Amino acid sequence: MFFAEIKQEEVIVGGFRIGQGFDVHQLVEGRKLVIGGVTIPYEKGLLGHSDADVLLHAICDAVLGAAALGDIGRHFSDTDPRYRNIDSRVLLQNVGNLLAERGYRVVNVDATIIAQAPRMASHIPAMVANIAQDLRMQPGDVNVKAKTAERLGPVGRGEGIEAEAVCLITHMNQTTD
């Protein structure tokens, strides 16, 4: 059978979808550093309209992308005063609600924070717990890693922090077994 002859229902086996997200923000003085919903002691914070949580923003984009719902800017514009300094956990919870309204749930999240400093390892368990809670998942279905940029580029020079995320979603009536 040629691909053109396959019906749409046959193409979407199991109803699984993959999403990918990315975010980057500049480090500046005078702001607190919030990553994964965790306030991290550091002399600089991330610049942005919201709390500039790069990790949660990347996850929001991954989840929205998997559901073909655009990106974080489409739903939470950085020109809308309602989102000024908003806790990005609220945004992630809202993204989870949008997903559920369309009959999907997140199966797993895998994310990477890229920062020359500060060290993230001791904060990762709290980040994982926040993400799992906000997306109504088990912590064992969330993975967060931290890497340096090996002193290369703007992130390596300590000018900013990046995050990347991928996720798998499925219809709530589907099982992953």
Swiss-Prot record:
It catalyses: 4-CDP-2-C-methyl-D-erythritol 2-phosphate = 2-C-methyl-D-erythritol 2,4-cyclic diphosphate + CMP. Binds 1 divalent metal cation per subunit. The keyword Metal-binding applies. CDD domains: MECDP_synthase. Its EC number is 4.6.1.12. 4-CDP-2-C-methyl-D-erythritol 2-phosphate binds at residues 23-25, 49-50, 71-73, 76-80, 115-121, 157. The record marks H49, T148 as: Transition state stabilizer. Pathway: Isoprenoid biosynthesis; isopentenyl diphosphate biosynthesis via DXP pathway; isopentenyl diphosphate from 1-deoxy-D-xylulose 5-phosphate: step 4/6. InterPro entries: MECDP_synthase, MECDP_synthase_CS, MECDP_synthase_sf. It is an enzyme of class 4 (lyase). GO terms for biological process: isopentenyl diphosphate biosynthetic process, methylerythritol 4-phosphate pathway; terpenoid biosynthetic process. Keywords: Isoprene biosynthesis, Lyase, Metal-binding. The keyword Transmembrane does not apply. GO terms for molecular function: 2-C-methyl-D-erythritol 2,4-cyclodiphosphate synthase activity; metal ion binding. A divalent metal cation binds at D23, H25, H57. PROSITE patterns: ISPF (PS01350). Pfam families: YgbB. Its cofactor is a divalent metal cation. Involved in the biosynthesis of isopentenyl diphosphate (IPP) and dimethylallyl diphosphate (DMAPP), two major building blocks of isoprenoid compounds. Catalyzes the conversion of 4-diphosphocytidyl-2-C-methyl-D-erythritol 2-phosphate (CDP-ME2P) to 2-C-methyl-D-erythritol 2,4-cyclodiphosphate (ME-CPP) with a corresponding release of cytidine 5-monophosphate (CMP). Homotrimer. Belongs to the IspF family. HAMAP family: IspF. This is 2-C-methyl-D-erythritol 2,4-cyclodiphosphate synthase. It comes from Nitrosospira multiformis (strain ATCC 25196 / NCIMB 11849 / C 71).
